[in-house]
Amino acid sequence: HLLKMLSLMLDGDKRVSSEQPGEQSKRPVEILLPKVEDEILRADLKKATAIPARSLLFNIDQKFDGIGGTHEAPILEVFMKVPNELQGYYGNQGYVAQFEHDLNKRGQFEAFKQTYERVNGRSWDNDRDALATVTKRSFAKAYAEQFGGSEDDAIKVINDAKDSYRLSIEGFASRVKEYLASQPPGFRLNFFVDEAGQFIGQERSRLLNLQTVVESLASATDGRATVFITSQADLEGILGQVKFEQADDLSKIQ
């Protein structure tokens, strides 16, 4: 439960309802501090929790379930899905999330969603999971209504978005940096990843992918995005009889 406790403590928006009638909800740290006797630990807790931050807690194996695509870099796919969902984009299809993000950057996303619901009688959020199949024509109607052009032109837009979408570690790090830039000064984004060891298994490529994600994220955000990882099983045990270079890879993450 340590990972969950840390995620709650470090998230500036998290509140715990009081069991006492009439009392306002409190931050988890406000409940914990009166029970901490060590003054140094108390000071460290106050300092850490005073930093504005958002916690993203997820089980990596569960979060991976449902993602579409080639799965050439499954670790990266999950890490990209999480901030997409945080911002209200569709996490299971990267090209749809990228399309939504691009509209949002131009200040057109909310207007498009309103047009979609008015034209089709259904919400965009409920329909977008079937965009590649049954709702493509519904998308075309709404897109043509909002931006002009024909419905065939609209279908070409979303097809081109799918064909041109490429997921990269640099793109992911850039998106996180962009999100942080929209937040108050000093704001941090913390990824709390549960069961990473089980998901990595004996696949060295996943281990290296995780290492690169962590390093790129820290570099792009000047340390304002941090990755916390837990595993019920020891990572060395999961990897089995690793070769020397694999053990070296592992040490870079630990």
Locations of the language-model features?
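Substrate-engagement module of ASCE P-loop NTPases
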Residues: G12, R175-S182, N209-T226, D249-I253
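Short secondary-structure boundary/capping segments
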Residues: L3-G12, E72-F79, S205-Q211, D234-I253
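Conserved P-loop NTPase "ATPase switch" module shared by AAA+ and STAND
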Residues: L56-K63, P184-S205
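P-loop NTPase motor core
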Residues: L2-D129, Q254
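Beta-sheet entry/capping signal
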Residues: H1, R54-L57, F187-F191, R224-I229, ...
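Sensor-1/coupling segment of RecA-like P-loop NTPase cores
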Residues: L217-F244
